[in-house]
């Protein structure tokens, strides 16, 4: 697989290092963090669930997001 060398600041390196999981390369980290995330509005009007069920789904999604971002 071809590679490319890049220069990043020490701060950027430290942040990337904090995101790195066991057994993961820095390339893996960059790919994982830059994967396209779907916008919730993309799903607007497509759910047939009740408002309460949708609210529950959104809250669970936020908890999952916080768990990954704040840990």
Swiss-Prot record:
Q: Does the keyword Oxidoreductase apply?
A: no
Q: Which family does it belong to?
A: Belongs to the UPF0330 family.
Q: Which InterPro entries match?
A: Put_antitoxin
Underlying gene: vapB15
**Membrane-spanning regions, if any?**
none
State the protein's purpose. Possibly the antitoxin component of a type II toxin-antitoxin (TA) system. Its cognate toxin is VapC15 (Potential).
Q: Superkingdom of this entry's organism?
A: Archaea
- Quote the protein name from its UniProt record: Putative antitoxin VapB15
| Swiss-Prot/TrEMBL keywords | Toxin-antitoxin system
